[in-house]
């Protein structure tokens, strides 16, 4: 069965973007190394992403394991759904109370569903034995509250935003995590991975 991993790059104070949806220096580490994340046709879509050797040893296997991504409508709108070619995987599920945009890549088999549990179920089916990568934010916070998240993964960048879009969204209640099973210092990024305590 697939593993659901809540993931994003995050500031030290827990934000995945500022109040205006700008990421500032959060993604700088994706471009400060010598190891390209993508090769072949993927490199044509994401040509300049090269990370440090240390980060590559963690990020590349993780990205290669992703079978399906789940995003909220806000991220979908910001990225235009990556033009139906999400980074690191073939499948995408969008959680939204609004329908698929008219004319948006009619050839793409991208489900739009308004229920988080249903979205995770569809994503698990599409991912097979692969990872379901759940983008951090409000939808992921709901999934964590519903007990649908197996792992919380953060790429922490040394910047303080002060305010913005929260990694866990508007999360209710306390959720215990296990001790991290990954703590890896990259170049201007700290990779952390916490299994969710059951």
Where are these regions (language model features)?
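Portal/gating segments that form or line small-molecule/metal binding sites
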Residues: 2-146, 158-198
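Short acidic amphipathic segments
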Residues: 148-150
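A mobile, often basic/glycine-rich helix-loop segment
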Residues: 153
């Amino acid at each position: 069965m697939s593993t659901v991993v809540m993931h994003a790059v995050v500031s030290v104070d827990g934000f995945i973007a500022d109040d205006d949806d700008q990421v500032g220096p959060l993604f700088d580490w994706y471009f400060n190394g010598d190891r390209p994340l993508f090769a072949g046709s993927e490199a044509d879509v994401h040509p300049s992403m090269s990370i440090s050797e240390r980060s590559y040893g963690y990020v590349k296997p993780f990205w290669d394991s992703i079978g399906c991504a789940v995003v909220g409508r806000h991220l979908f709108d910001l990225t235009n759904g990556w033009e139906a070619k999400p980074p690191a995987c073939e499948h995408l599920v969008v959680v939204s109370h609004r329908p698929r945009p008219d004319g948006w890549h009619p050839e793409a088999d991208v489900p739009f569903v308004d229920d988080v549990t249903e979205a995770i179920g569809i994503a698990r089916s599409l991912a097979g034995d692969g990872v379901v990568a759940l983008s951090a934010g409000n939808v992921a916070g709901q999934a964590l509250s519903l007990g649908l998240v197996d792992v919380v993964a953060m790429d922490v960048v040394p910047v303080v935003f002060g305010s913005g879009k929260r990694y866990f969204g508007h999360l209710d209640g306390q959720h215990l995590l296990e001790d991290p099973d990954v703590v890896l210092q990259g170049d201007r990024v700290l990779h952390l991975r916490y299994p969710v305590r059951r």
